[in-house]
């Protein structure tokens, strides 16, 4: 039930003082409302109960296991939140001069340096992108700016493997490139012959995730980097899966020229629900002139923002100020808590947990998409045979998992694996939690074989069960209040 449906005329949390004409006398007539604002009217208790009930329906990492593949739903240490909310940080205004922001700027400079060190991007890091997708855009925009500066306008193509993150082709297109898809071979690696055939004078670069979304490490990455560079292109690294190699392997050492990092994933800042995010970008020396601004510089013992005057070839600003400051501070605290010795342990335990769950699920009878490969931080189970034999699909299994108080893994992604579940346990989960998840999956598999209708009817314990997904897509209702969309159409004289 929406809060508007709980509204009762005349009910309110506080008494409203009568409006005096003198209060609005200076307000032009065209800005004065002719009718009451269409806001819900409830008592304070009704409002508190409404939102408390909604919060109790939420699924979060604070309450249950969240193995959502390629999303790195790890626990966010509370110390990161507490320190990021110190009064000195909260009270700083974005327009405050550098001289009044030395503590904040020092943290941002150190964060840039730590990210540069752990990724091997020697040209530097910019923290200004406010989401992973914006970081992607910044990365490809820098590739474009690099070629444009060299007047190499023939380079109109970006190569994207078919196992890439779904946003990669969209990003390349937004930057004005034509996308060429590169197939994956049977072992989960980039098809090298197809790559060689695609490279040429029109190649601007290639977008890669390593480990890939298939949950395997691209074993011939150095050869790929050499081939792309020999063809005159650049390598973009999608940092979606950086958690698997943190402190172990550096993208810069693999030959990448630009990387975006999801600080809201790998570096444990809260995410989900649309934000806030942080998509910091790191570059090699050749792309440093094109970095998005502002970037924090250290001069002696003082810190300042570098602007257009310092980087005249910059692709420009991507946020009004300097990125999501609160998210960046949380990532900074997280990295300081881990230290140089702690970062490799993130990769070690995330891959250990993934391989443990993968091995146990295989023992329980689940089919792996790439049985001959070790998992990195995530892996893929394919239910194509189960669906053929029982008509129980990956979506059915995902729905049934909700009844066991586990969030479903990512379903039907990546697209090239049929009936797939992409499972990422992260490094912060205990063996007991992982064992419980495995047993739940095994029980669902047995149900699918003996009582398929039970699985196909799930979930049974949720406030909402199965939705009419076709109707939801065709009769979209995302208005801010019931009937609002129709009212606005009528007011503007538009027709459906």
Curated annotation (Swiss-Prot):
GO terms under biological process: glycine decarboxylation via glycine cleavage system
A family per Pfam: GcvP2_C
Residues with N6-(pyridoxal phosphate)lysine modification: 265
A Gene Ontology cellular-component term: cytosol
Tagged with keyword Methyltransferase: no
Cofactor: pyridoxal 5'-phosphate
Enzyme class (EC, first level): oxidoreductase
Keyword terms: Oxidoreductase, Pyridoxal phosphate
EC number assigned by the record: 1.4.4.2
Record's catalysed reaction(s): N(6)-[(R)-lipoyl]-L-lysyl-[glycine-cleavage complex H protein] + glycine + H(+) = N(6)-[(R)-S(8)-aminomethyldihydrolipoyl]-L-lysyl-[glycine-cleavage complex H protein] + CO2
GO molecular function: glycine binding; glycine dehydrogenase (decarboxylating) activity; pyridoxal phosphate binding
UniProt-listed NCBIfam families: PRK04366.1
Family: Belongs to the GcvP family. C-terminal subunit subfamily.
HAMAP family according to UniProt: GcvPB
Physiological role: The glycine cleavage system catalyzes the degradation of glycine. The P protein binds the alpha-amino group of glycine through its pyridoxal phosphate cofactor; CO(2) is released and the remaining methylamine moiety is then transferred to the lipoamide cofactor of the H protein.
Subunit structure: The glycine cleavage system is composed of four proteins: P, T, L and H. In this organism, the P 'protein' is a heterodimer of two subunits.
Protein name: Probable glycine dehydrogenase (decarboxylating) subunit 2
Organism: Thioalkalivibrio sulfidiphilus (strain HL-EbGR7)
Source lineage: Bacteria, Pseudomonadati, Pseudomonadota, Gammaproteobacteria, Chromatiales
């Amino acid at each position: 039930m929406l809060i508007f449906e709980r509204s009762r005329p005349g009910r309110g949390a506080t008494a409203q003082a009568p409006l005096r004409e003198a209060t609005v006398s200076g307000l032009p007539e065209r800005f004065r409302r002719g009718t009451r604002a269409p806001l819900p009217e409830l008592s304070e208790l009704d409002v508190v109960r409404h939102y408390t009930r909604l919060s109790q329906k939420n699924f979060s990492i604070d309450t249950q296991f969240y193995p959502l593949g390629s999303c790195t739903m790890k626990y966010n240490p509370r110390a990161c939140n507490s320190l990021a909310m110190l009064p000195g940080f909260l009270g700083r205004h974005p327009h405050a001069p550098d001289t009044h922001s030395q503590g904040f700027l020092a943290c941002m400079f150190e964060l840039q340096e730590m990210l540069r060190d752990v990724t091997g991007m020697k040209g530097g890091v910019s923290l200004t992108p406010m989401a992973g997708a914006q970081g992607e855009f910044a990365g490809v925009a820098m590739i474009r700016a690099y070629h444009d500066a060299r007047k190499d306008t023939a380079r109109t193509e970006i190569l994207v493997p078919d196992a890439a993150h779904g946003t990669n082709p969209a990003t390349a297109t937004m930057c004005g490139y034509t996308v060429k898809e590169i197939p994956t071979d049977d072992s989960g690696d980039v098809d090298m012959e197809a790559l060689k055939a695609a490279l040429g004078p029109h190649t601007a670069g290639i977008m890669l995730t390593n480990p890939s979304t298939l949950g395997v490490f691209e074993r011939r990455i150095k050869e790929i980097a050499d081939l792309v560079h020999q063809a005159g292109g650049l390598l973009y690294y999608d940092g979606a899966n950086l958690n698997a190699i943190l402190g172990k392997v550096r993208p810069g050492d693999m030959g990448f020229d630009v990387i975006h990092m999801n600080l809201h994933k790998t570096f444990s800042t809260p995410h989900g629900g649309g934000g806030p995010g942080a998509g910091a970008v790191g570059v090699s020396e050749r792309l440093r002139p094109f970095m998005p601004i502002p970037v924090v510089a250290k001069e002696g013992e003082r810190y300042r923002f570098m602007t257009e005057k310092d980087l005249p070839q910059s692709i420009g600003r991507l946020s009004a100020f300097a990125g999501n400051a609160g998210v960046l501070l949380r990532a900074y605290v997280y990295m300081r808590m881990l230290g140089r010795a702690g970062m490799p342990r993130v990769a070690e335990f995330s891959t250990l947990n993934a391989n443990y769950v993968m091995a146990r699920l295989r023992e329980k009878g689940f089919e792996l998409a790439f049985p001959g490969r070790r998992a990195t931080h995530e892996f893929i189970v394919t239910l194509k045979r189960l669906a053929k034999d029982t008509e129980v699909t990956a979506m059915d299994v995902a729905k049934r998992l909700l009844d066991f108080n586990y969030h479903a893994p990512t379903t039907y992604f990546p697209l090239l694996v049929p009936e797939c579940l992409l499972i990422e346990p992260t490094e912060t989960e205990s063996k007991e939690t992982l064992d419980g998840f495995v047993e739940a999956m095994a029980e669902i598999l047995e149900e699918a074989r003996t009582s398929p209708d039970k699985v196909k009817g799930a979930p049974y314990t949720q406030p909402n069960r199965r939705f009419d997904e076709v109707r939801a897509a065709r009769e979209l209702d995302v208005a801010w209040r019931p009937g609002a969309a129709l009212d606005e159409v009528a007011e503007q004289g538009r027709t459906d």
